[in-house]
Amino acid sequence: LHDALPISKSFAMGMDIPLIAVNHMQAHILAHFIDKGKQLPSFPFLCLTVSGGHTQIVKIDSPSKMQVIGTTLDDAAGEAFDKSAKILGFSYPGGPLIDKYAKGGNIHAFTFGKPKIKDLDFSFSGLKTSILYTIQAGMKENPNFIAENKEDLCASIQHSIVTILIDKLTKAIK
């Protein structure tokens, strides 16, 4: 954004076209309703936005009135997927590979630490550390630990991340 904004302004000025500022996260939320045939949802509603850099719960009162009620404190959910995948030796982006291998795994094979944040904010750094320590301990005992447990590890990682998201969203609904 830091580099793109001046370039965008210069381009718009040079082409004599308007430059319309759009909030990146609002665009994520409202992009689903761009289709002219789609009806806007009833307001208010909650939106869970998950990406590599952001994890947010947003209360939407109208297309122009939004309130973030839970946000990323350290690492976002997408980053937790990608960093976990890196620990497993997968290429970037790792989230799709974790999802692929998780389909054949047992979600209860491994348990990882859960964040102890009481409000609606998200923290995935502790979970990432727990995943790292579990894998390091397994590799110390068995050099083939990742290969032999890849599906179960992926299923357990995915389950842990998604459970955190669902728990926070459920709390926000109440």
What is each PLM-predicted segment?
Residues 17, 22-45:
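Conserved phosphate-binding catalytic cores of ATP/NTP-utilizing and phosphoryl-transfer enzymes
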Residues 47-49, 55-59:
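Short beta-strand scaffold segments in enzyme catalytic cores
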Residues 100-174:
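A contiguous, well-structured pocket-lining segment that forms one wall/lid of small-molecule binding clefts
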Residues 19, 47, 94, 109, ...:
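A cross-family phosphate/adenosyl-ligand binding-site feature
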Residues 3-5:
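Short, small-residue-biased leader/transition segments that mark boundaries at the very start
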Residues 1, 19-27, 48-50, 73-76:
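Active-site nucleophile and cofactor-binding loops and adjacent substrate-binding regions
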Residues 23-26, 62-106, 128-138:
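Glycine-rich phosphate-binding loop plus the immediately following alpha-helix
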